[in-house]
Regions:
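Glycine-rich, hydrophobic membrane-spanning regions of integral membrane proteins that mediate transport
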Residues: 1-330
Length: 330
């Protein structure tokens, strides 16, 4: 096994994915503290209590939604939830014990014992697969390239997953304004709803659709190259999400949300910014996940929380220059 493949197998270890999952809530909490701290540092002392309270509600609602989003999406779509660390350790222990009982202790025993509860190094993985690929594949299953026929289930899961933090951000933002902006809160609702629609369509849903369409075309053309699949899905994301999503979100906001729901005929255009275009890290995660790289999955709550946060503060190309909220981009 080459060093590059060994590193890839290292990242594919189910125990690694489960450990990353375990640390996502504290990472989100720490990130929220940084956002609140930086915002309060830039806010006049007389406004800090109000700004801190509003941000706390928005971020709290967004983070809780993001943490529970995988289970909600799995419940709706029927997709299997990720295994917990304890379940993986138990399965690995049974697998190793069965192997040792059948073949006895040998040169792989030390590595196999370690694999029960811990991470194997790339060098240990290389030794394991060179000596016994069968047991290696059972402990570290190879990534599965999702076929076109299964793509809609995966896209459905990703799209619901992304919708939950955005909805949480909107709800948190409205609640925060309702508490701290008693007279003006209703006027701020349209921006939150429209930004939520923009974030969801341009940065999540249509990006997933674009990746899925591209994957379907590649399957139809019988193109198996992982590099070609990756490039194709990125192209689909750029065309449908970054470009098409922005146009569709603006149309819905100006023709439906503002005039019909909020009785406001004012039209505004939310344009993609440089950071919107360059920091589509959640799309990288989408491509990776659709390519079978499960270790990227734990990062989704963090990435989708960014969209939820921006929806919660009603970010609209910073049209309010007095806003002190940090402009995190998705």
């Amino acid at each position: 096994m080459t060093p590059v493949k060994a590193i890839g197998k290292f990242l594919d270890q189910p125990i690694l994915t489960a450990k990353i999952n375990k640390y996502i809530p504290p990472v989100l909490a720490s990130g929220s503290c940084v956002v609140i701290g930086k915002t309060l540092n830039e806010t006049p002392s007389s406004e800090r209590k109000k700004e801190g309270g509003k941000l706390g509600i928005i971020l709290g609602s967004t983070i809780l939604s993001a943490i529970f989003a995988p289970k909600i999406a799995s419940k709706i779509t029927g997709r299997n939830t990720s295994k917990t660390l304890s379940v993986i350790k138990d399965e690995n222990s049974k697998l190793v014990d069965t192997y040792i009982s059948e073949y006895g202790k040998n040169e792989l025993s030390k590595i196999l014992e370690k694999s029960k509860t811990g991470l194997l190094s790339p060098n240990e993985i290389s030794i394991l697969f060179n000596k016994n690929k069968d047991i290696g594949d059972k402990l570290i299953p190879p990534p599965d390239n999702i076929k076109a026929k299964d793509i809609f289930k995966e896209i459905g899961w990703l799209s619901i997953f992304g919708a939950v933090p955005v909805a949480g951000g909107i709800v948190g933002g409205i609640a925060a304004d309702r508490i701290y902006e008693k007279k003006e809160w209703k006027n701020k609702v349209p921006d939150k709803v429209n930004e939520g629609i923009y974030q969801y369509l341009a940065n999540i849903f249509l990006c997933n659709i674009g990746a899925g369409i591209a994957l379907g075309i590649l399957e139809k053309l019988n193109i198996k190259s992982k590099m070609a699949r990756c490039i194709g899905m990125v192209a689909g994301i750029l065309l449908t999400g970054v470009i098409g999503g922005s146009v569709m979100a603006n149309y819905i906001g100006n023709k439906l949300i503002n005039p019909v729901i909020f009785k406001d005929k004012t039209e505004e255009k939310r344009t993609p910014e440089l950071l919107d275009l360059s920091l589509h890290t959640d799309d990288i995660a989408t491509v990776s996940l659709l390519s079978g790289l499960k270790w990227i999955e734990p990062s989704l709550p963090i990435l989708y929380s960014i969209s939820g946060y921006r929806a919660g503060i009603g970010y609209r190309n910073d049209k309010n220059p007095k806003s002190k909220h940090i402009k995190v981009s998705a």
